[in-house]
């Protein structure tokens, strides 16, 4: 596997820490050892997160190509757009963000706090759009790029989740290589890796990265899109493309992609009672915050699988914390009593 041939522009502090979730593990019976790898602590750029790791492999193209405006898209509380705005500010570029109405959630401050608030503070041109949730290429995003061109700018396209960019999966191939190095220091290998999946490139990169040591199907994706067929297809497609890019040496198959569909409901961006219980339990056992859109759902999945005995006794499970906590402010009504 050859990841080193791709240029990388450092936006993160370095390897993200792995630490044990001792109290949560004990609370769930102590038969499974839970750990977290903290992508939510990966950068000083506006709280960082998994998209910041991905952007390290996209930004060299933007710099070398002389692009002056980063153009991205997401929901109103998109973590992606906040991270793109931060990178643009860091690099001295302009930023245009299309924020679509991906979540059927009514709150008076939903479009004024959290991620979107930070993007505005960082100087991004934030454009609200009424279109609903979809993980594909969007007309509103294409229109934003055309607007930049007409104004004399040179837009660099960054699709939702970085996922439709040909190099969108590389950052999490690097994640897998980083985990392997940390496992050498820890003196053991993780048996399973749990990760949230929506647009697909995070899990796709992990699948390729861990395929290098035979653990592709030990990456347990927890769907948070509530459109799992579309998400699964995208994970598989991106993983196959990424495997070719890094010269993995074997094809990624359907069996390599594990996507658990039990925890994504009722729909994208809306937590269920299990999500909320998992957020509170993790926070109160470990002081580790997760959000109602992504990480709360993957945390719910991991907790439920431990409770159900789906991980064999003695397993070591690595939870990939991808970020997303800034969105908590937009859901403050749900937590008004804690």
Curated annotation (Swiss-Prot):
Obligatory cofactor(s): pyridoxal 5'-phosphate
Keywords attached to this entry: Hydrolase, Pyridoxal phosphate
Segments traversing the membrane: none
Residues recorded with modification N6-(pyridoxal phosphate)lysine: 51
GO BP of this protein: 1-aminocyclopropane-1-carboxylate metabolic process; amine catabolic process
Molecular function GO terms recorded: 1-aminocyclopropane-1-carboxylate deaminase activity; D-cysteine desulfhydrase activity; pyridoxal phosphate binding
Active-site positions on this chain: 78
Subunit and partners: Homotrimer.
UniProt xrefs under PANTHER family: 1-AMINOCYCLOPROPANE-1-CARBOXYLATE DEAMINASE-RELATED
Name the UniProt record assigns to this protein: 1-aminocyclopropane-1-carboxylate deaminase
């Amino acid at each position: 596997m050859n990841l080193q041939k791709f240029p990388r522009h450092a936006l993160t502090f370095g390897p993200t820490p792995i630490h044990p979730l001792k109290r949560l593990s004990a609370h769930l019976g102590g038969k499974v050892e839970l750990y977290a790898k903290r992508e939510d602590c990966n950068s000083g750029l506006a709280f960082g997160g998994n998209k910041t790791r991905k952007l390290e492999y996209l930004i060299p193209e933007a710099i070398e190509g002389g692009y002056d405006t980063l153009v991205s898209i997401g929901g109103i509380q998109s973590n992606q757009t906040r991270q793109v705005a931060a990178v643009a500010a860091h690099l001295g570029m302009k930023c245009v963000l299309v924020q679509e109405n991906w979540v059927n959630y009514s709150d008076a401050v939903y479009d004024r706090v959290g991620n979107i608030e930070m993007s505005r503070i960082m100087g991004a041109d934030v454009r609200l759009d009424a279109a609903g949730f979809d993980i594909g290429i969007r007309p509103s995003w294409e229109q934003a790029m055309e607007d930049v061109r007409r104004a004399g700018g040179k837009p660099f396209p960054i699709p939702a989740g970085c996922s439709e960019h040909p190099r969108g999966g590389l950052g999490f191939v690097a994640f897998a290589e980083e985990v392997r190095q940390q496992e050498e220091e820890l003196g053991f290998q993780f048996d399973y890796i749990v990760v949230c999946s929506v647009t697909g490139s995070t899990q796709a990169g992990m699948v390729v990265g861990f395929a290098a040591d035979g653990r592709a199907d030990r990456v347990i994706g927890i769907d948070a899109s509530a459109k799992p067929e579309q998400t699964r297809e995208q994970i598989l497609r991106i993983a196959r493309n990424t495997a070719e890019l890094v010269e993995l040496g074997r094809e990624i198959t359907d069996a390599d992609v594990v996507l658990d569909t039990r925890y994504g409901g009722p729909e994208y961006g809306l937590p269920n009672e299990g999500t909320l219980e998992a957020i509170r339990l993790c926070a109160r056992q470990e002081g580790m915050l997760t959000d109602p859109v992504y990480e709360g759902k993957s945390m719910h999945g991991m907790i439920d699988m431990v409770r159900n005995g789906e991980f064999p006794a003695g397993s070591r499970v690595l939870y990939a914390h991808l970020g997303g906590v800034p969105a908590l402010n937009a859901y403050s009504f749900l937590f008004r009593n804690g």
